[in-house]
Swiss-Prot record:
Gene Ontology biological process terms, A to Z: cell division; cell wall organization; peptidoglycan biosynthetic process; regulation of cell shape; UDP-N-acetylgalactosamine biosynthetic process
Protein name: UDP-N-acetylglucosamine 1-carboxyvinyltransferase
CC per GO annotation: cytoplasm
Subcellular location: Cytoplasm
Residues given in the record as phosphoenolpyruvate binding sites: K22, N23
Predominant localisation class: cytoplasm
Binding site for UDP-N-acetyl-alpha-D-glucosamine: R93, R122, P123, V124, D125, L126, D308, L330
PANTHER family documented for this protein: UDP-N-ACETYLGLUCOSAMINE 1-CARBOXYVINYLTRANSFERASE
PTM sites of type 2-(S-cysteinyl)pyruvic acid O-phosphothioketal: C117
Organism, as annotated: Helicobacter pylori (strain ATCC 700392 / 26695)
Length: 422
């Protein structure tokens, strides 16, 4: 198992190229199961979750060819398998995204209940109810979801009691081959949803209301779609993380290959803290702040402040003057990084879903353990400003969502080494 050894308090400067968005790539990979013709997907990040989804598609009978490290050609014309097995699905929760396309195209499928994420309860109930609204019969048998719609899916209203990104994505993919019109009410509004909609539209699906909380889909009355090639949008969470690298080290960094509009909740907060940002069409440059002020954050669905940036801002709060307050409203158990930040010297108190951070605090290098994907990046951020050497263990979490993180940070001047546990 690998760990990162990080020498703290090293000056940083330079530019970072942002990779394609993992959270856009995963549903788009799943959606290729709907396609009769081969599809080329560009700007795929080389991260563990993408490789796991590619392996799952291959296991279902899709043909895969990597044209270069970030471009994959997928052919799902002659799929011969509609069972997503536990061995593959347990590796990540996003595997549930194959449920909608498999059911829509083949009228029956078996999908293992997912694993792969340590952040509280992320129930699949919303996905199952959405499929039932479209006419599917669902049973849970020996840890598998067995979904059937012998006569095909039929358009209907799907009302989500709670906003769900993957639930919205699964409903969209299922509705794309359903007869008639489907309305998804209380839909998620993330940019990744908008890109999935554009991908489905390329195959002839009519979708209205993109970017709003109500989506209207007219399915293609056929047994498959003819989807077109697509380039994955830049990863707004990776971009936000590197902005936080600049912010926590108080360095001048330029973040390239981004869509600034997708980052507004993050950039607004950085400006409030005291940073000067030069925002261009596809880049943001962060300049050192004279004084970093404490702040308050409440995580919300897009376009609110993203829960996936909460941990990084908790690390940043340790270097801000005053008392910062972070309220997590979307997931339980999402403060597991707090105790590890405390090992580095952070002054953090927790009360249910609210964290209070007192700063500014001098952090000291230590051994810390990553507990989930975004927590791992928060520990790397803190280690960059800690006095001495830190070792971040269990970085397989980090590898799920960040492409070549140590290479990108080292290119800025950092001293980060990936080593093997003894």
């Amino acid at each position: 198992m690998d760990f990162l050894e990080i020498v703290g308090q090293v000056p940083l400067k330079g530019e970072v190229e942002i990779s394609g968005a993992k959270n856009s790539a995963l549903p788009i990979l799943a959606a290729t199961l709907l396609s009769r013709q081969e599809v080329k997907i560009k700007s795929l990040p080389q991260v563990v979750d993408i490789k796991a989804m590619a392996l799952l598609l291959q296991n279902l009978g899709a043909s895969l060819e990597w044209l270069n490290p970030n471009t994959l050609q997928i052919g799902a014309k002659s799929l011969n398998h509609t069972e997503a097995t536990y061995d593959l699905v347990r590796k990540m929760r996003a595997s549930i995204l194959v449920l909608g396309p498999l059911l829509a195209r083949f009228k029956e499928c078996l999908v293992s209940l997912p694993g792969g994420c340590a952040i509280g309860a992320r129930p699949v109930d919303l996905h199952l109810k959405a499929m039932q609204q479209l006419g599917a019969k669902i049973t849970i048998e020996q840890g598998y979801i067995h979904a059937k719609a012998p006569k095909g899916l039929k358009g209907n209203d799907i009302l989500f009691d709670k906003i769900s990104v993957t639930g919205t994505e699964n409903a969209l993919m299922a509705a794309s081959l359903a007869k008639g019109i489907t309305r998804i009410i209380n839909a998620a509004k993330e940019p990744e949803i908008a890109q999935l909609c554009a991908f489905l539209q390329s195959g002839g699906v009519e979708i209205h209301g993109i970017g709003s909380s109500e989506l209207k889909i007219r399915g293609v009355e056929n047994d498959a779609l003819n989807l077109k090639d697509i380039q994955i949008i830049p990863d707004r969470i990776e971009a936000g993380t590197y902005l936080c690298v600049g912010a926590i080290t108080n360095s001048q960094l330029k973040i390239n290959h981004i869509i600034p509009n997708h980052l507004q909740a993050i950039t607004d907060k950085l400006i409030e803290i005291g940073f000067s940002l030069d925002i261009q069409e596809n880049s943001i440059e962060i300049h050192p702040a004279k004084k970093r002020q404490a702040f308050e954050i409440t995580t919300k669905e897009y376009p609110g402040f993203p829960t996936d940036m909460q941990a990084q801002f908790m690390a940043l709060a340790t270097q801000c003057l005053g008392t910062s307050v972070i309220e997590e409203t979307l997931f339980e158990n999402r403060f597991m990084h707090a105790s590890e930040l405390q090992r580095l010297g952070a002054n953090i108190s927790l009360k249910t879903n609210v964290a209070t951070i007192s700063g500014s605090t001098e952090l000291t290098g230590s051994d810390v353990m990553a507990t989930d994907l975004r927590a791992s990046s928060a520990l790397v951020l803190a280690a960059l400003v800690a006095k001495g050497v830190s070792r971040v263990h269990r970085i397989y979490h980090l590898d799920r969502g960040y492409e070549r993180l140590e290479d990108k940070i080292n290119a800025l001047g950092a001293k980060v080494a990936r080593l093997k546990e003894k």
